């Protein structure tokens, strides 16, 4: 996938300009950069990841692409633990949910980061069995059953992109209730 694919997986969510967002499991920021393109430079984005070097790379790329790191807040943290962040207008979880076996528990935890009627966008492999690199993926159909149990609306499929590894990626949005 390239930057255009990342943007196109997020774009159909129609996120508002400005606001406060988080990319949970941001890594080197592929989806953080796509999110920035869609919500603008006035939005605050928390890029949360356990890997400090990936966050440093993201900060450098963000500065190069947008001529600033203003409103980008890298957090070298594990998002499955409490975070000292304000309530969010939206969360992106791109290829981070599949590392958790108990997805409902993680989604309930993430729900606590969000304001009412806020968006959770996930990007995942559209398969239910994984491998050592993608241990616990979930299909869109599985996510549709899971999200309401964690306090979210019925998810809406946003886009699909082919994958060389595990069939395809999908993006979906669900809202806090």
Regions found by a protein language model. Name each.
Residues 1-19, 34:
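Conserved alpha-helix/loop element of class I SAM-dependent methyltransferases that forms part
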Residues 89-103:
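A short SAM/SAH-binding and catalytic strip from SAM-dependent methyltransferases
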Residues 117-125:
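Conserved beta-strand signature within the Rossmann-like core of class I S-adenosyl-L-methionine
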Residues 161-177:
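Core SAM-dependent methyltransferase catalytic element
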């Amino acid at each position: 996938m390239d930057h255009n694919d990342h943007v196109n997986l997020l774009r159909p969510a129609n996120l508002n300009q400005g606001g406060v967002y988080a990319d949970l499991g941001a890594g080197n920021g592929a989806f953080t950069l796509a999110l920035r393109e869609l919500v603008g430079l006035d939005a605050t984005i928390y890029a949360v990841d356990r890997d400090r070097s990936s966050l440093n790379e993201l900060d450098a790329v963000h500065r190069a692409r947008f001529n600033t790191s203003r409103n980008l807040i890298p957090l070298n943290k594990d998002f499955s633990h409490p975070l000292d962040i304000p309530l969010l207008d939206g969360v992106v979880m791109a290829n981070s949910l599949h590392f958790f076996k108990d997805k409902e528990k993680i989604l309930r935890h993430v729900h606590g980061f969000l304001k009412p009627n806020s968006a959770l966008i996930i990007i995942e492999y559209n398969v239910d069995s994984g491998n050592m690199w993608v241990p616990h993926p979930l299909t869109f159909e599985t996510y549709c059953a899971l999200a309401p149990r964690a306090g979210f609306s019925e998810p809406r499929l946003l886009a699909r992109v082919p994958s060389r590894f595990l069939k395809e990626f999908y993006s979906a949005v669900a809202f806090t209730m």
